[in-house]
């Protein structure tokens, strides 16, 4: 397969291919420009994979630029978490990290240029009045009474804004475009506002801050961005993007292209709604494994390669659509099935005693870490007289379809012997407390000598050598596919989205590294929690089941 065939094709790449073929550009330069006012989520991952992926495939560059023009909502914690997430996803930015605040001096100069050209003015309408004067989709706006101030007056007033002589909301700088435009974004948009807030990069140097639409296009141009790629909600803003660059003296004029944002079933990605989940303690934090944040997915056990594959599979289009959550689960399931070592864990234990196995004896069995990858090696698993098995793997009576342990019948223990359930003990409530079995010592790694068929295989953990563990069984956070459309999305939270159970794991898992994925045989894919797990108190998060657990729910 050629390099071109290996690349995922989409309309943006077709534009880039044409630009390069026509000689419009000789190289490709993209950027990923998050605002450092929150944690990145799976929707941002789509943009990261697109922008950094394009730069990689075309041997170009991609900048990481923080759009830090709103100091009241931004801080260094978000800056560091975003850098960590981008790196974790497998990407590296070109050169140093960029900040829009790096260009505050330049932006101020460009604002003065617009004033000097009669294309910007200082307005003293209140924010409420500005909204009122803006008009509606069906009615044009009306001019501010301050719109026709002279250039000299506007320059003097803008300098006073910078000097801190206006209170917040008392004055702003607006572009002079067209109050009757059919695009509301072009009705004299605000370019600068007064904010007496300390900035995490520039300190208290500034008390006026540029708006996103003024900053974004100029930052792109100053960095030499060739293709400015953003989501569809900025489609109308492209007119303002071009207007600003057309009316200032700047050598580079990037072009903006829009694609559809990611909409994923059974989750929300609105920053406001995610913040509500955290502040109302409906989840444990931004890195709760049920959250769609990169940090939450990482803690749950999602791998960078699975997220990149998901972004590749869903593609890049201009059409808004809802992606099935199972598509994301399929990517991590495929990844871990291929790469995760196997281990055994019992989540709902009942004791099994092999009466003809010598008490106090520990037999060390050797089990493969992966059934199809001998290069992943083996592990030693202790086998003892007393074991734990899953409660659901035993029945007193069952039909022929039940391929697990039944009273009076045989089953094979994974990687070990054939056993037969001989009798049981129950407590006063009728619950089975112990299953007493016999084992066939001639069946380790081979079938019974007399040719009898034993079809079922169940997993187990030594009761004497196994290690206690907590298992956090995560499911989708919401019960409806589109919780964001509900009147109160919080009422659609799935009460079964987290169930905690206590069980046992084989001893090799004591040293399990946080976030490293395992297949717990027959139970699903799990990883040690990166906050709460320790060798002294193991905590495993279920990343995803062996199959889609919601299929049955949907069918019902």
UniProtKB/Swiss-Prot annotation:
SUPFAM superfamilies: Nucleotidylyl transferase, Ribosomal protein L25-like. ATP binds at residues 35-37, 41-47, 231, 261-262, 269-271. It comes from the Bacteria. It comes from Vibrio cholerae serotype O1 (strain ATCC 39541 / Classical Ogawa 395 / O395). Monomer. A motif ('KMSKS' region) lies at residues 268-272. GO terms for molecular function: ATP binding; glutamine-tRNA ligase activity. This is Glutamine--tRNA ligase. A motif ('HIGH' region) lies at residues 34-44. One of its GO terms (cellular component) is cytosol. The keyword Membrane does not apply. It catalyses: tRNA(Gln) + L-glutamine + ATP = L-glutaminyl-tRNA(Gln) + AMP + diphosphate. CDD domains: GlnRS_core. GO terms for biological process: glutaminyl-tRNA aminoacylation; glutamyl-tRNA aminoacylation. It is an enzyme of class 6 (ligase).
């Amino acid at each position: 397969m050629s390099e071109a065939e290996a690349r995922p094709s989409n309309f943006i790449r077709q534009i880039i291919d044409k630009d390069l073929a026509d000689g419009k550009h000789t190289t490709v330069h993209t950027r990923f420009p998050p605002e450092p006012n929150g944690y990145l989520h799976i929707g941002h991952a789509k943009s990261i994979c697109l922008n950094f992926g394009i730069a990689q495939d075309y041997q170009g560059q991609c900048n990481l630029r923080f759009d830090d023009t709103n100091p009241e909502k931004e801080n260094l914690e978000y800056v560091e978490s975003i850098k960590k997430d981008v790196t974790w996803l497998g990407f590296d930015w070109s050169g140093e990290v960029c900040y829009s605040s790096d260009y505050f001096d330049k932006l101020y100069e460009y604002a003065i240029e617009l004033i000097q050209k009669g294309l910007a003015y200082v307005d003293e309408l209140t924010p409420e009045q500005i909204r009122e004067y803006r008009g509606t989709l069906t009615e044009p706006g009306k001019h501010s009474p301050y719109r026709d101030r002279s250039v000299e007056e506007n320059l003097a007033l803008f300098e006073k804004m910078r000097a801190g002589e206006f209170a917040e909301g008392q004055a702003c700088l607006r572009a002079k475009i067209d109050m009757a435009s059919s695009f509301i974004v072009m009705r004299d948009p605000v370019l600068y506002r007064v904010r007496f807030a300390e900035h995490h990069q520039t300190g208290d140097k500034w008390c006026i801050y540029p708006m996103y639409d003024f900053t974004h296009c100029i930052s792109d141009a100053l960095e030499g961005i060739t293709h400015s790629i953003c989501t569809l909600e900025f489609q109308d803003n492209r007119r303002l993007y071009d207007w600003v660059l057309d009316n200032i003296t700047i050598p580079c004029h990037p072009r903006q292209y829009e694609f559809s944002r990611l909409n994923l079933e059974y989750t929300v990605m609105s920053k406001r709604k995610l913040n509500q989940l955290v502040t109302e303690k409906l989840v444990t934090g931004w890195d709760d494994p049920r959250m769609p944040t990169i940090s939450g997915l990482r803690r749950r056990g999602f791998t960078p390669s699975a997220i990149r594959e998901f972004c590749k599979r869903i593609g890049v289009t201009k059409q808004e659509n809802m992606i099935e959550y199972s598509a994301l689960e399929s990517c991590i399931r495929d990844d871990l099935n291929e790469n995760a070592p196997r281990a055994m864990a019992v989540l709902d234990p009942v004791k099994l005693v092999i009466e003809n196995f010598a008490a106090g004896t520990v037999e060390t069995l050797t089990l493969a870490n992966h059934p199809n990858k001998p290069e992943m090696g083996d592990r030693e698993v202790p086998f003892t007289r007393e074991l734990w098995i899953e409660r659901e793997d035993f029945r007193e009576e069952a039909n022929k379809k039940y391929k697990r342990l039944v009273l009076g019948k045989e089953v094979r223990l994974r990687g070990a012997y054939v056993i037969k359930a001989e009798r049981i003990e129950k407590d006063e409530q009728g619950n089975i407390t112990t299953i007493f079995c016999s084992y066939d010592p001639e069946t380790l790694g081979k079938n019974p000598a007399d040719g009898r068929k034993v079809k079922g295989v169940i997993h187990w953990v030594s009761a004497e050598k196994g290690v206690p563990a907590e298992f956090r069984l995560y499911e989708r956070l919401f019960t409806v596919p589109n919780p964001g459309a509900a009147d109160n999305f919080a009422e659609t939270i799935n009460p079964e989205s987290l169930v905690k159970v206590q069980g046992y794991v084989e001893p090799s898992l004591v040293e399990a590294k946080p976030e490293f994925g395992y297949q717990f045989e027959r139970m699903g894919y799990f990883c040690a929690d990166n906050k709460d797990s320790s060798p002294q108190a193991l905590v495993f998060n279920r990343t995803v089941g062996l199959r889609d657990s919601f299929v049955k729910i949907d069918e019902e």
